[in-house]
Structure formats: C-alpha cells, structure tokens
Amino acid sequence: MIAGQKKRASDVVKELLEARGHDVTVWESTEERIMQLPESERAAAIANIYAQKQPISNLTDHYDLILNLVDVNSGGTVQRIVWPAAKGTPDQPFYVHEIPTIVVSVQHAFALADMPQVGTYINAYDGKDNTMKALVEKLAGESNFTGVSPVDA
C-alpha cells in the first residue's frame, strides 16, 4: 500500500473508540488549519497565531481524557517531537496536570524524552491497525499491559 493512502494511527484509534461508544475529538493543529487556508490568507493567520491561546477551562470543561498519539518518523534524520509555534493550544501538552493524559508513541520508542511531564506513556512501536486494536483493548482493561520498555526503564 502506498503510504499516502494508509490511515493514520489516530484515525484508526478514533474509529475503534467510537465503535465502543466513546465521544472522540481529534485535535487539528493550528498549523494544519492554516495550511488549509488559501495562500492569500495564510500570512494574516500566521500573524494572529497567538490569538489561538485559550484558557485551560476550554479543555477541562469538555474533555475527560487526552490520548496523545505521537507518530514520529522513525526513519528520519531527526527523531524528535516538533512542537508547533502556537502557545497555549492543545498542540503542546501544558494540560497534563489538569486532565488525565496518556501518551502513546507509535513508530518511535524514544518520545518520552520530549514529554517527561506525562504520567502515563505507552510504547506501541508501530501504528498498524492490529496494534491500535490491541492498544484500545488494553486501554479498555480487556487485557493487561505487560513488560517494561527497554528504552525508558
């Protein structure tokens, strides 16, 4: 399958969670929204990027849990999470002490170094459909997480 046609891990997890009756919102980053604008409107949107900042109550009043899927290209020359320029938006995990937050790393086992403030970190090692299915089953308590990450132990 051509990589461009493959579903993102976040889309697969969203479908699996919704099939179990959960309400799921996938955050579209500020940068992604700006890139979808007509080119003539992008400069003004970039100049206004800090207006995207919002109070923590906008998150705590609407969400019970944040599941942050980190999909870093493990074959790239730089294997780090790249935080967008927008400050105070859900793009950056500033909310980890106000909302239960789980980080799941797919493709790359070393993302914890970029998010040490997160209390729950899971290495899924890949974003394949069957791995995401097993992840959701484990999050639902249908089977136990076992083992210790050889990377972050």
Task: Indicate residue ranges for each PLM-predicted region.
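C-terminal non-catalytic regions of proteins with extracellular/luminal or membrane-system context
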Residues: 1-153
